[in-house]
Amino acid sequence: MRFTFAEAMTDPNFYAPLAQAAEKAGYAGFTIPDSLAYPEESDAAYPYTPDGNREFLDGKAFIETFIEAAALGAVTSTIRFTPFVLKLPVRPPALVAKQASSVAYLTNNRLALGVGTSPWPEDYEFMGVDFARRGKRMDECMDIFRGLTSGEYFEFHGEFYDIPRIKMTPAPTEPIPLLV
């Protein structure tokens, strides 16, 4: 049986020693939190607290997900890193594919992606993305991600994205798992 060390909101200075200790203890995976920003005001309720309050997130330091994964990959050798949960549809999918492929390449395929839509309208607003169509956008993002991380030429023509026939390298030597 394989286990993942799930860490969410600790001081980022502790991530490297925690990842090393988790690897030494036999853990197969290590989660990395994802957050882009914290709004000063919001009408959106947090779905995982009884009262919908998310003030506990205010001031928490979240290192950019792929940078954190690359940094942790440099100080470990076997443990797999999984952003949990990467807010995929607020990001350009071609950039996510490039970032993920680069981390997978540098870490010998030790990256998986936990992806979701984000319940926060503010994440979409400040990234210039329509919140109302996030589900369909996420579907397109996953298709683009899979295609661009394949190591083959790929093109995509959808409702939100239009990508000419391109190839991204380096490509991971194994498919990057998507956990939805």
Tell me the role of every PLM-derived stretch.
Residues 40-41, 51-54, 70, 79, ...:
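Internal, glycine-rich beta/alpha segment that forms the wall or movable "lid"
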